[in-house]
Structure formats: structure tokens, C-alpha cells
């Protein structure tokens, strides 16, 4: 079985840059193994929202910490970024913080790409997935080679070199919400990323089997693939606070279909705030008893996920980190 790891999701949509750095530093002090950050150009909310640049954040946190692994969860290397520049940025960070950097990638959302100049109708999944696969191939060729020529359907290189690259390149974690991309993660990813709260059958019957199937295609040991899940958890001994803390993150409770074509944080906020608190809370483990919280998290471990990254919704993140270290971490470590 793969090693059990506990991580912290730094909520870039909720906190300003300096505070977000300090929270990651605190996460290491409270015993977390990793800290991940989303890469949004625009947040889910216009009022009270934030969107610091993920790569600047990673570098700042890297300088302030010594142990935790840092990565994006996730970045889209296909539209507003050129994947060659992403490859250069992550190679540099991996040289600065050896063994501590990974690149988490996904197929992208209209919210972040249309505002930065994408022209035309937002592409359907088939094209976005094709772009992702091509960008991963391109980045790995740059990390392996010298004077690289690449002639893809979407991206091209001519005599390109990255001059500072760690041995072995940079681990790539592939985010998936369905079996097609999960299978690709098993075949081509160093890690796999998914998010919690979407029903047992998705993880147990679709995502994890697809990762295993993809690994088998390339004769890989699935235990060598870091299987990460962002666990949405609102834990507090005060049950009313545990419930109310979820409200800021109401946009996560919108369906993929509802979010697909929304490219404006004001419209996203409006759609999300129309949801009742009970619907918002369904995406979260809302608990005031530590044993109850850990029992719900254990399901994900039993289904085959080993890297548990905890996303807490409340504004008092230091309170969450203290409660996590005291109440949840000792119980969770025993699961491994």
C-alpha cells in the first residue's frame, strides 16, 4: 500500500497572498506533509475573493519551509499558459527545493481562461483533454532533452532547451473527475488528484479502478502512483460553526454543467449564493466529533486514496490547523 500522507489545501480564492503564505508555513509547523494551491486567475467570488499567483506563492513558501511538498492543485498548462513556460517555471522551483515540488494539472475552466483572452466558444472536454495530454508530452520532452523540436496539434517547439532541470524532471499529478482522465493518470501521471464529496461509486467503482487500469497498460505498479484527494472538511467542536463555515465555498456545490460556461466571478457568486446552506454543506464532511470525521475520511483510504489533502472552509484557518493537529491527525495517522 502507498504511504499515507496528510496535506493542507491553501485556499487561494479566500486569502490574500501574505496570509496564504503564512498559513502554509503554519501547516508545516502543525505537522502537515504537503501544501497545495489552486491556480485561478479569478476567484469563485467577486466580493471578498482573492486570486494570488500560484507560482509566486509556491516560491515564497519554499523559502519559508524545509520539509513539506508543494504543488498546484491544479494548474491548466494549455490556454493562458504556454506549456513550455510552465515546464521552465517548475524545473526552476524543483532545483530550488529539491524533492519538494510537483505540478498538478487539469483540463481547465472558462472562469480562468476567457478573461485572459481565449477567443471563441469554450472548448468541450474532448479538446481540453487532448490539449492536456499534448502539453504533458511537451513538458516531459523538455525536461529530458536538449534542443527539442515538437510539432503537435496545439503546441510547437523549435530547438528549445531548459537549462536548469533537476534529475528526473518534475512529478506531474493529473486531476480527474471521471474515468477517462483517471485512466490517463494511471498510464502517464506520477500522481492522481480528485476531490471529495461526490458519492462512493465515483471513487470506488470508477476513478480508482480506472487509475489501476491505466497503470496496468504501461506495466506500472499502482502503488507507485501518489493518489491524492482534496477532502472538503469543516471540522469544529461547535456544530453550528462547522456548518456555517461552509457558506463561503458555495460555488463548489454548483454542478459541472452549471459552472461550465460561467466566466465571471460575479455571475458565479450569484448562482452559488442562491443555494441553501444544506445543499452547500453536502460537498463537505461537516463534523464536530473527531471520531465521526475520521470515520468518514477513512472511506477514501479504504477505496485506495493515500494522500489526503484537507481543505477547510472557515476564515479562521489557524483554528482549523490547531484542531486538526490535536484531534484529527493522530487518528488519521493510525489509518496508515
Curated annotation (Swiss-Prot):
Any Pfam family matching the protein: Bac_luciferase
Protein role: Catalyzes the coenzyme F420-dependent oxidation of glucose 6-phosphate (G6P) to 6-phosphogluconolactone. Appears to have a role in resistance to oxidative stress, via its consumption of G6P that serves as a source of reducing power to combat oxidative stress in mycobacteria.
Name the record gives this protein: F420-dependent glucose-6-phosphate dehydrogenase
Signal peptide: none
Active-site feature positions: 40 (proton donor), 109 (proton acceptor)
Top class in the EC scheme: oxidoreductase
Keywords: Carbohydrate metabolism, Oxidoreductase
The protein's assembly and partners: Homodimer.
Originating gene: fgd
Disulphide-bonded residues: none
Reactions catalysed, as given in the entry: oxidized coenzyme F420-(gamma-L-Glu)(n) + D-glucose 6-phosphate + H(+) = 6-phospho-D-glucono-1,5-lactone + reduced coenzyme F420-(gamma-L-Glu)(n)
Binding site for coenzyme F420-(gamma-Glu)n: 39, 76, 107-108, 112, 177-178, 180-181
Protein's organism: Mycobacterium avium (strain 104)
PANTHER family in alphabetical order: 5,10-METHYLENETETRAHYDROMETHANOPTERIN REDUCTASE, PTHR43244
Family recorded in the similarity comment: Belongs to the F420-dependent glucose-6-phosphate dehydrogenase family.
EC number: 1.1.98.2
GO molecular function, one term: oxidoreductase activity, acting on paired donors, with incorporation or reduction of molecular oxygen
Domain of life of the organism encoding this protein: Bacteria
Chain sites annotated for binding substrate: 195, 198, 259, 283
Alphabetical GO biological process terms: carbohydrate metabolic process
